[in-house]
């Protein structure tokens, strides 16, 4: 999305018109709405498939911003039960957005240990912006040896 959320919402709308059942489209559109700060649209988009972990991820972020922290925690619990440590990177972004830097950094370190493919987005992911000045975050970034 490259922080081009309005364009992303429009593009995902086109994709949904072609294939309304493609599960990733609603979750990605939900993240675009989240990036725009349109939390009601993010919620609506991500509630379409409540059993899909991607939607649970989006809802964990969105519910928290809507002041529904217990519901947000329930979504994380569903993710952990369904896919466990394989979503270490996603848990890190959730905790970063919730303001829990220590837990976010722990999950990023776990992501590094398990070689979570989400780490490829570490340098540009806006969900991790709250962590960028943390020495532990910077150490992870150095260890990943991104090109300058």
What annotation goes with each model-predicted range?
Residues 1-148:
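Alpha-helical protein-protein interaction modules
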